[in-house]
Regions:
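Short glycine/proline-enriched turns and hinge-like loops at secondary-structure junctions
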Residues: 43-44, 61-63, 81-82, 101-103
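Conserved short histidine dyad/triad with adjacent acidic residue
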Residues: 31-62, 92-96
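A short, N-terminal "cap"/entry segment at the start of jelly-roll beta-barrel domains
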Residues: 1-43
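Glycine- and acidic-residue-biased ligand/ion/polar-headgroup-sensing regions
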Residues: 53, 62-78
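Ligand-binding loop in jelly-roll beta-barrel domains
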Residues: 93-116
Length: 116
């Protein structure tokens, strides 16, 4: 039987990262590789996010669910919560936050809505 589905395989250790510009201008110290993320389809999809040591994300509001899996390093939210390797984190719609990293991190992000 002929396979009719489309398949895409991404090796996370063999990708090219580009400056993270999801909010317009690139954010210093942040880069990404879009796996299936597409802002024009309502912000649905998956991407790899790489943050260099000392990088900080912009404060943002989640209009849909954002979930991520920590692959490398640590990520810190303003309330002091530290996300570590292996943590799977869910932010529900209506949640706002920003994050930073001391030593850098790699995160696999699953989006179900555009951040504001």
């Amino acid at each position: 039987m002929k396979q009719t589905s489309k398949r895409k395989i991404t090796n996370i250790f063999d990708v090219i990262f580009k400056p993270f510009d999801n909010y317009g201008s690139p954010i210093p110290g942040m880069s990404w590789h879009k796996i299936s993320y597409n802002k024009t389809n309502g912000g649905q999809g998956t991407y790899l996010l790489k943050m260099e040591p000392g990088a900080k994300s912009l404060p943002h509001l989640h209009t849909g669910f954002e979930e991520f899996l920590m692959l490398e390093g640590e990520l810190i939210d303003p309330d002091g919560k530290i996300f570590k390797i292996g943590d799977f984190v869910t932010f529900e719609p209506g949640t706002s936050h920003s994050s930073h990293t001391k030593d850098g991190c790699l995160v696999l992000v699953f989006m179900r809505g555009i951040n504001e």
